[in-house]
């Protein structure tokens, strides 16, 4: 009777699983940070109220500029991982999307803020390509490969939960945090909470820097590079007569799905009702009047 058990993992495979899981988790963490910081950051950098039309206009511009940059460089991800290696590109992309939000936290102009947020999107999109490629090559067993590609990508869903929890905590405790040289808005005594949230984007760089020295480059990539077989297939091949219909339909459906998901994730309560903070302050001033009215009605 044939042995159908899957081969046991090596230390290298476990390390790559951990690195990929961290990468996917913080992919979503970094992306979903945008709807939380975009409006307050733009309002502060332009020195206008949150409900000013300029804020809405620039939030929209930020989203499409960052998404366009990420998409273009994501398309180049395949070439990059073939040219420079899976490990090197994945490390560079994770460090890029870790350091860029930290730099954005110190932005004092809108162009600088948009530049670093676009750099974050580029890092996320390239990291996704590198991680998928690296994982696929690490597991020669088909069942293990499919299982762990799914499991590691599932960590992306935790990124949204993590950034929400961190954002809530910073909103409650931001005034107690050290300033760390962060810029202040006009008339403010404490940095905006959005700056602290952006600073947390550097977190994935710490475990990656500690783990990567112990992980070798993909052996599959090294063997193919030595054999000179890394030449990528022609882009036109996927539009061959027998594949054209599948390619076009799949591309359209994928574009719609990603477009809807990306757009929906940017709609937060702060964007739907940008005047809530002002209404809260107005409600506080009405408390004494309500008490007087209640006393008169007794």
Give the ranges of each region predicted by the language model.
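Transmembrane-helix signature of 12-pass secondary carriers
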Residues: 1-298
């Amino acid at each position: 009777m044939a042995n159908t058990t899957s081969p046991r993992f090596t230390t290298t495979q476990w390390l790559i699983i951990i690195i990929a899981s961290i990468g996917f988790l913080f992919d979503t963490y970094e992306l979903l940070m945008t709807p939380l910081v975009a409006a307050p950051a733009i309002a502060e950098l332009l020195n206008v109220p949150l409900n000013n039309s300029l804020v809405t206009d620039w939030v929209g511009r930020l989203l499409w500029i960052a998404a366009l940059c990420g998409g273009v460089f994501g398309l180049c991800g395949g070439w990059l991982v073939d040219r420079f290696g899976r490990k090197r590109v994945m490390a560079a992309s994770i460090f890029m999307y870790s350091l860029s939000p930290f730099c954005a936290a110190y932005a004092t102009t809108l162009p600088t803020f948009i530049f670093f947020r676009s750099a974050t999107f580029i890092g996320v999109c390239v990291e996704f390509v590198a991680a998928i490629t690296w994982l696929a090559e690490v597991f020669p067993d088909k069942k293990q490969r499919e299982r762990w590609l799914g499991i590691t990508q599932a960590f992306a869903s935790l990124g949204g939960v993590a950034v929400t929890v961190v954002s809530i905590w910073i909103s409650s405790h931001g005034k107690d945090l050290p300033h760390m040289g962060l810029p202040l808005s006009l008339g403010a005594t404490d940095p905006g909470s959005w700056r602290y949230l952006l600073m947390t984007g550097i977190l994935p760089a710490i475990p990656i820097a500690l783990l990567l020295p112990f992980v070798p480059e993909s052996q599959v990539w090294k063997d193919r590079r030595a054999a000179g077989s890394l030449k990528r297939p022609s882009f036109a091949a996927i539009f061959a007569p027998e594949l054209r219909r599948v390619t076009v339909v799949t591309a359209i459906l994928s574009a719609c799905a990603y477009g809807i998901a990306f757009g929906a994730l940017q709609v937060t309560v702060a964007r739907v009702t940008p005047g809530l903070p002002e209404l809260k302050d107005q409600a506080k001033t009405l408390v004494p009047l309500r008490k007087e009215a209640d006393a008169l009605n007794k």
